[in-house]
Amino acid sequence: MSADGAAIQSELARPPCPTGVGTASAQADGAAAARGASGALRMQVHEWAEAPLAARIAWLGRLQDRVARGAEALVDEICADVGKSRWEALATDVLPLVDSIRWHRRHAARVLSGGPVAGRPWWMVGMSHRVDRVPVGHVAIIATWNYPVQLLGIQMVQALVAGNRVTVKPSERAPRSQRALLELFSGELPRGTLEWTASDRAAGEALLRDRRFDHVVFTGSTEVGRSVAETCARTLTPTTLELSGCDSAIVLADADPALAARGIWEAVTMNAGQTCMAPRRAIVDARAWPRFIEALAPLVGASGPARLVSEQSAARVAECVRDAVAGGGRPLRGVVEAPSGVHWRPAAVAGGSLMSDLARGAHFGPALAVLAADGLEASVALHRRFDQHLAVSVWCSAARARAMSRDRSMLAALGAGVVTFNDAVRPTAHPATSIAGRGPSGWGASRGEAGLRAMSRDIGVSCTSTRLRTPSGEPTASVQSIFRRLTGLGRARRAVAGLDSRGTRPSADPAGSEPRARTPQP
């Protein structure tokens, strides 16, 4: 082991950093001091990046143990921050994080390892080529609140195992749970590897204004995402933006209506509708419409009040439902209830205007617009009228699902980064699955293999022999002729010379002759 490797392993064995590091003391520093410290650190390769990948993966194993032991404490803080039930906090926040850590322990070495590059042209004789992967450097993560432990935790796992320094701006809506998570992560890390700011909005604005990063990861609304993109564009800082998804569940004629209604409604009401990949509208084939509505209505009627993150969120989703009903939609519950503080009873509205805020998904709560379409093409066309595509679900027969799941043109037409068949939201928890938005839903990949690769950068490396190497300078005419024959360039030049101005080979028929029909052979 090298001296550097031994020093890193010694550092990894140290007791955890004091909790003040990266928190209160960092907040007390002035903007100028922060810029100076950031600049000094950027001038050197950080020691965590110098740690062998095997050492960083071993740290993941110890992190997994700490998260598992601290699961109940994390659940307490999640419930206090955002009001989830204990089961939902455990199943949708803590468990996916533990599964992701386990997956990265098994697969990070493969994803992050470089290797030789095949396909060297013959004229590059004496050269060897490979691609190496190194950390991007210093990563800023601006965290969100709806899955405060799962989303931030996975993003930190990927940035840290790739060897980066990380600075986190916690969400102002989830300060307790994310502070607890950060303290679990900071154990055993070299000092300065993981820092965090205050959780208020001013801290987020100052983070990008006063400091420079090599990559910024943001999860949140499209409006704020645009602001982050504009700020980072001034310094050409790469970003990963995981923004709003207002997607569709497409129910085809051969779908099991009871299964579709149950699966879609479960996704709509999960986490009180505060899931960016949850469906905001169900587009139902007219032939399946009566059975689907019949199956969905009792599920809507049986739903109890959901707790949203704020009174404003509850009021907004209730307003969208009222407007959809006023525009001609039919509430499947029969009445539209007013919110009670942060609590509101989930609702679904059948029919109505395609341009309503409910149909467009202009809310973040447990409400569903149910729209009709005639067949698959019309369903996809209606889905594409809405511009935010993150995760689409398609409900159909098992045989049709198998065929459509392999139809690349159909998958591309849906426009989303994730397509699920006969399920919604839950399959996206697979730790190898990446989330990649397009257009108003963001850009760049987070989670999965693509998200992990995004936390590193490629370096193309070549070594040329000092003895066997391609001669420099322009070769003689005879050597150039041999070169053309060996590379096929001579044949290509003759072929191009035989084409007319339109890029087609001239006909052998006499000029002006009419094309003749082919004579059938007896």
Give, region by region, the residue ranges found by the protein language model.
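Rossmann-like NAD(P) dinucleotide-binding subdomain of oxidoreductase/dehydrogenase enzymes
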Residues: G119-L259, I283, A373, R502, ...
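Structural signal for hydrophobic packing residues in well-ordered secondary-structure cores
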Residues: V45, A49, Q64-V67, A71, ...
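Alpha-helical structural signal in soluble globular domains
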Residues: Q64-R66, E77, V98-S100, H104-R105, ...
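ALDH superfamily catalytic-core signature
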Residues: G5, Q9-L12, G20-A28, E188-L189, ...
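Conserved C-terminal structural/oligomerization subdomain of aldehyde/semialdehyde dehydrogenase
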Residues: S2-D4, C17-G20, A24, H343-P522
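N-terminal Rossmann-like NAD(P)+-binding subdomain of aldehyde/semialdehyde dehydrogenases
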Residues: M1-S128, A302-P305, P506-P522
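Residues at or immediately preceding the N-termini of alpha-helices
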Residues: A31-A34, L53, A71, P257, ...
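Residue-level signal for inorganic ion chemistry
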Residues: R56, I101, G163, L194, ...
